[in-house]
Amino acid sequence: MSSPDIHADQGRRALAGGLSRAVLARAVKEAFLKLDPRQLTGNPVIFATWIVALLATVSAVAAVVGQQPAGFAIQIAVWLWATVVFANLAESVAEGRGKAAADSLRATRVTTKAKLIVDPNTGTWIPTPAHKLGVGEVILVEAGEVIPTDGEIIEGMASVNEAAITGESAPVIRESGGDRSAVTGGTTVVSDWIKMRVTAEAGSTFLDRMIAMVEGADRRKTPNEIALAVLLAGLTLIFLIAVVTLLGPGKFSGVALDPLVLGALFITLIPTTIGGLLSAVGIAGMDRLLKVNVLATSGRAVEAAGDVDTLLLDKTGTITFGNRMATEVIPAPGVRPDAAMKAALMASLADETPEGRSIIELARNAGLALEAPEGATAIPFTAQTRQSGLDHQGRSWRKGAVDAVYRTLGLEPQSIPTELSVAVDRIARSGGTPLAVSEDGVLVGVIHLKDVVKPGVKERFADLRRMGLRTVMITGDNPVTAAAIASEAGVDDFLAEATPEDKLRLIREEQGKGRLVAMCGDGANDAPALAQADVGVAMQTGAQAAREAGNMVDLDSDPTKVIEIVEVGKQMLITRGALTTFSIANDVAKYFAIIPAMFVVSLPALGALNVMKLHSPESAILSAVIFNALVIVALIPLALKGVKYRAVGAGKLLSRNLTLYGLGGLIAPFVGIKLIDLVVSALGLA
C-alpha cells in the first residue's frame, strides 16, 4: 500500500474506532480556547453560563480580597467554568475526530508534476506542477503515476487504484466515455495510460472538498438546530424570570438571597445539557456518515435524510444484482430434471459470462459438478447464432435464445411441447429471460434467467415502511417486468420505462405533496434529479456533474447505501430529541428538588415538598451545580455514538423515548443531587 493510501486508511480508522489520545488531547486544548466569549454567542445557554461563571469569579475574588468567606463562591465559580468547558469539550471531541480524518486526508495530497500535453497531434508534453494546471487543459498519466488532479478521461483506458479516496484496494477500470470517465486527484494509475481533461482548479478538487467537508468549515446550523436554539433561548428567559421572581418570596420570608446563589440556581435550571451537546450531536451525525464512507456537504443534508418521506431507488445494483442469474431449469416432457440440468451445465462449461457461471453454480447446488472434457470444442456466442455450447466426440450441447435454438433444431411453434411454451411465456411475463437447452439436437428444457433481488432487501424495505418511508423503484424495464420485481422486492411503488426527465418530474410531484425525497445516481443525466432531491447521493465513481449536483457523495459507490444514510439521519434526529427531552425533564425536576431546600428553613411548610432532605440551602445549590456539570460529561458518549436506532413506527419511538429519557430525566436529578449532597456535606464543602 502506498503512503497516501496508508494515511487515508489511518484516517478512516480514526473515525471508525474510539478516541485516540491525540484527538482527546487536542479536544481538551480547544475546549479551553473556546472560552473566548465571541465563540459562545451562538449558543445562548452556554453563553449565559459563561456570564454567570464570570460574575461568580468576580464575587469569589472580591470575597478573598475583602477577607470574607470565599469557599462557597470559589466552588460555584469552578463548577460553572467546568460546565462551560465540558460543553466545549463535547463539541471539540466531535470536531476532533473529523479533524483527525481531515489531517490524514491532507497527507494523501502529493506534490507532483503533470505531463501537460502541448501538441495534441504529436502527443508532446512538458512537465508542469499540478497546482498550475488550469481547467480544460489535457494531461497524460501513465502506469505507476499519481493522477495529479480531478478530470475526465478523453482517451484511453486504465486500471486505477482509488484506495486513497475510497479505502478499497482493488483497482477499478476507468475509461473514456460513459459514466466511468471521471478520475480523482490523488489516485494512482496501476496499468495502461489515459489522457484526461482537467476539471478542477487547485484547491477545489474532490480531495480538497472532502477535507473541507470533514473539517466542517461550512457547518452552518440546520433549520431544526435553529428552531431548537430559539426554544432553548425561550426557556432560558423563562427560568431567568422565574429566578428573579424568587426575590419577592425571599424578602417576604426573611431569606436574604445572595446574587451568587440566584445566579447558580439560574444555571442549574436552564437546559444546559442539550445546550452543551447540541453542536456535538450534529457534528457526530456527519462523522457517523463518514464512518460508512459517505461525505455530506452540510449538516442540513444529514438532517434532511432523517426527515425523508420518499426514497427513490434504482432497480439495477440497488434492489437487484444487475446480472441475470439462473434460478431454475425446466425439463421438457419426458426428460428427467437431472438430465435437463446436466445438459444445461454441459452447454455452459465454456461460458465465461456471469449468466454462464450462474448456470454452473445452479448445477453445483443441485449436486452436479463437472469440468469441460479434455479435447472438447467450445462454441462461442455470436450475434448471428445467439447461442453457445460445447461439442465433444460427436455430441453437442447448446443453450441460447429460444427462437434461435428452435430454428437450429428445425422446430415449428406448433411442435413445441405445451409445457415448455407455457414456461417460456411465464418467464418472459415475470421479467426474466428464457434460454432453450438442447442435447444432441433434441430440445431438453428451458433455463430461467432473472435479475435476482438482493437477499435481505425485502426485509429492509419492510423496516423502512415501519419507519414511515415510501419506497419507489425506478427502472427502465417495461411495466410488466417492473411490477413483478417490485412485488418480489416489496417496494411500495415503481416507475417503469423511466427517463431522467421522469425522475425529475416524480421528485417534483412528491415535493409538491410536502414530502422530502432522497435518491441516488451516478450518471450525468442524473444530475438534475440529484440537485432537485432533498437528499441527493452521488456515486464517487460517477460523472463529475452528478458529484457536483448531489449533497452527499458515497465513496464506495454502493447505491444501497442510501438506506443507511436515511438511518443515520434518523438516528441523529432521535438522539437530539432524546437529549432535549432528558434536559428539559432535568430542569423541571431540579426546580422542584432545589427550591424547597432553599426555603425550608424560613418556611417550614415547604418541608412536605423537601423530599430529598438536602443538608443545607448552600449544599443544595452546590450539589445542583456539580450535577449540572457532570451530566454533560456523562452524556458526551451518547451524543457522539447516538441513541440506538430501531425501525419502528413514530408512535412507538416517541413512547419509548418519553419513557426512557423523559422519566429518566425526571429521576436522575433527585438521585444524582442527593448523592452529591451526601459527599459535599461529608467533606464539609458547604
Curated annotation (Swiss-Prot):
Q: Which InterPro entries match?
A: ATPase_P-typ_cyto_dom_N, ATPase_P-typ_P_site, ATPase_P-typ_TM_dom_sf, ATPase_P-typ_transduc_dom_A_sf, HAD-like_sf, HAD_sf, P-type_ATPase_bsu_IA, P_typ_ATPase
Q: Where are the transmembrane segments?
A: 45-65, 70-90, 226-246, 261-281, 592-612, 620-640, 660-680
Q: Which organism is it from?
A: Caulobacter vibrioides (strain ATCC 19089 / CIP 103742 / CB 15) (Caulobacter crescentus)
Domain of life of the organism encoding this protein? Bacteria
Membrane topology per record: Multi-pass membrane protein
Q: What is its EC number?
A: 7.2.2.6
State any single GO MF term. P-type potassium transmembrane transporter activity
Chain sites annotated for binding ATP: D351, E355, F381, T382, A383, Q384, T385, R386, Q387, S388, K399
Q: Which reaction does it catalyse?
A: K(+)(out) + ATP + H2O = K(+)(in) + ADP + phosphate + H(+)
Q: Does the keyword Amino-acid biosynthesis apply?
A: no
Entry function: Part of the high-affinity ATP-driven potassium transport (or Kdp) system, which catalyzes the hydrolysis of ATP coupled with the electrogenic transport of potassium into the cytoplasm. This subunit is responsible for energy coupling to the transport system and for the release of the potassium ions to the cytoplasm.
Tell where it localizes: Cell inner membrane
What HAMAP family does the database record attribute to this sequence? KdpB
The keyword Magnesium is annotated on this UniProt entry: yes
Q: Which UniProt keywords apply?
A: ATP-binding, Cell inner membrane, Cell membrane, Ion transport, Magnesium, Membrane, Metal-binding, Nucleotide-binding, Phosphoprotein, Potassium, Potassium transport, Translocase, Transmembrane, Transmembrane helix, Transport
Q: What class of enzyme is it?
A: translocase
What's a Pfam family this protein contains?
Answer: E1-E2_ATPase
Task: Indicate the residues that form the catalytic site.
Answer: D314 (4-aspartylphosphate intermediate)
For this entry, the protein name equals: Potassium-transporting ATPase ATP-binding subunit
Family to which this protein belongs: Belongs to the cation transport ATPase (P-type) (TC 3.A.3) family. Type IA subfamily.
A GO CC annotation given for this chain: plasma membrane
UniProt-annotated binding residues for Mg(2+): D522, D526
